[in-house]
């Protein structure tokens, strides 16, 4: 029996201290990592709910354990809301992460050794899109397309590689591309070689749900996503598809029992409430502001002489290439971090440094938009980033920006209602 009155603070002060410090960091640091966001108190509450106690292998109405009548309600709500939100005919809400959702979709669509055509990691793809260090590059033969000289996806290269390699799956999706993907063009390329067309919208799912970024859900055979990032839900995954009963069976089997056991019911409940939040009119306003803030920041950095990959942004993120500066992405990330501005180093097209050093920065606006930043604050922030990058070893500049960033964060608290 455990002592129910002991708090984490009184029982485990070391862990409580780390959480307290992380809470403080989130309040006092400007978050510009494109894949991060701040969930609502409702999502936080459900992730700590009693649903974490329930084992529920299987699917609603078809469980291997008894006592699932109430978690069935939670999961069915999540399924129905996901389908409605994204205009999908099928949804599986059990994947534990976006990477796992991709692995499960691959399992349903390919056999080991089959060919996958996807975007190159250094041009904006993702580790799970066939990188040799990932399961996706170890279990499948990966071929990669990239960006053209204009910074757009090279569809002609993708079509040529499709004809040459006859992939089983053609994947469109990205982790660091600031443009709009022509989903229909990829559909046509896939059809030309009788391949499955799969999309990974992990980064833009919230924008797609809000209708401010084109949806691939009824164009692709299968769509995967995370449920955090722009969607602002718990850290987890989701698989969507248009109507195809045979494929739906294979997807369900790939998730359970193919690669997962018991689903995380507390996380699935948090997904359900996040999907409901994304259906509200204010979520579209939020998504529109994400785009405005990203464009404002990218424009300032261009004016200040920094190279924006693809020339600008049409979504929530943009890549800053530092190839023409005497700065590495690692140095830039560290200097900005000392000013309480959190970004991540990122590889860029034409990369000359290792993935642990890089020649670029990825900047995203979902989290600052959740705080309430608008174009004015986003533009100020971009100037501060440039001030540091212009004189990266000047600790006085860094200290001045840190003070201004802290003052700005104080005006836009993240979790004031939890204090």
Swiss-Prot record:
Known cofactor(s): pyridoxal 5'-phosphate
Site annotation Plays an important role in substrate specificity: residues: 228
Enzyme class, spelled out: transferase
Statement: the UniProt record of this protein carries the keyword Amino-acid biosynthesis: yes
Gene Ontology CC: cytosol
Localization in the cell: Cytoplasm
Main location: cytoplasm
Catalytic activity, as annotated: (6R)-5,10-methylene-5,6,7,8-tetrahydrofolate + glycine + H2O = (6S)-5,6,7,8-tetrahydrofolate + L-serine
The EC number(s) this enzyme carries: 2.1.2.1
A Pfam family hit: SHMT
Keywords tagged on the record: Amino-acid biosynthesis, Cytoplasm, One-carbon metabolism, Pyridoxal phosphate, Transferase
Sites bearing N6-(pyridoxal phosphate)lysine, chain numbering: 229
Gene Ontology MF, one: glycine hydroxymethyltransferase activity
Pathway(s) of this molecule: One-carbon metabolism; tetrahydrofolate interconversion; Amino-acid biosynthesis; glycine biosynthesis; glycine from L-serine: step 1/1
InterPro entries recorded: PyrdxlP-dep_Trfase, PyrdxlP-dep_Trfase_major, PyrdxlP-dep_Trfase_small, Ser_HO-MeTrfase, Ser_HO-MeTrfase-like, Ser_HO-MeTrfase_PLP_BS, SHMT-like_dom
Residues engaged in binding (6S)-5,6,7,8-tetrahydrofolate: 121, 125-127, 354-356
Any Gene Ontology biological process: tetrahydrofolate interconversion
PANTHER family listed in its UniProt record: SERINE HYDROXYMETHYLTRANSFERASE
NCBIfam families assigned to the protein according to its UniProt record, in alphabetical order: PRK00011.1 (NF000586)
Function, in words: Catalyzes the reversible interconversion of serine and glycine with tetrahydrofolate (THF) serving as the one-carbon carrier. This reaction serves as the major source of one-carbon groups required for the biosynthesis of purines, thymidylate, methionine, and other important biomolecules. Also exhibits THF-independent aldolase activity toward beta-hydroxyamino acids, producing glycine and aldehydes, via a retro-aldol mechanism.
Subunit structure: Homodimer.
Family classification: Belongs to the SHMT family.
Protein name: Serine hydroxymethyltransferase
Protein source organism: Coxiella burnetii (strain CbuK_Q154)
Gene name as annotated: glyA
